[in-house]
Amino acid sequence: GRSIMKTKIIKTLLIQTLLAVIVGFLVSIVANLFIEGARYFLSFQTASSALSVRFVDVDINLIPTVAMLISAFLIVLVRRSLGVTKWSGPADSIYALHQQKVGVDVRLGLGSTLAAFISASGGASVGQYGPLVHFGSTLSTMLSRLLGLQINRDVLLACGVAAAISAGFNAPIA
């Protein structure tokens, strides 16, 4: 009796710890790709004046406008191809915590994170950490479903949130 209970508790803690490490590792990679990728694409807007127009003694760079139009097209493409009916974010992660179903809608989470990346890369004033926090909980949901794990929902949300925040601020551990 008691020995079996201890073994079950230890097994559960090990699984939760392993999931936390995996999520932390993957979210840190995605967070850095998100931030550096957006910076990379934004650098093209200021580095080039190929679409510069002179109007009333003022040079107007049209690259930011073109970048936003391309971003808008790509976001519509993401929305249609993934069937996203509404964008999701950290509030949806918190809401999912209070529901019977474990985790967030993976399709909406991935679509929302991709749309936020496209928006930030195109120059929109989109926060970086909100989408990354939601991606962390989306990834936690994906892994727990893929592995068939029944883990505590508080741990599920905390793994994603802590991983995204620590990675976003280049902290080694949350």
What are these regions (language model features)?
Residues 1-174:
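Alpha-helical transmembrane segments and immediately membrane-proximal extracytoplasmic
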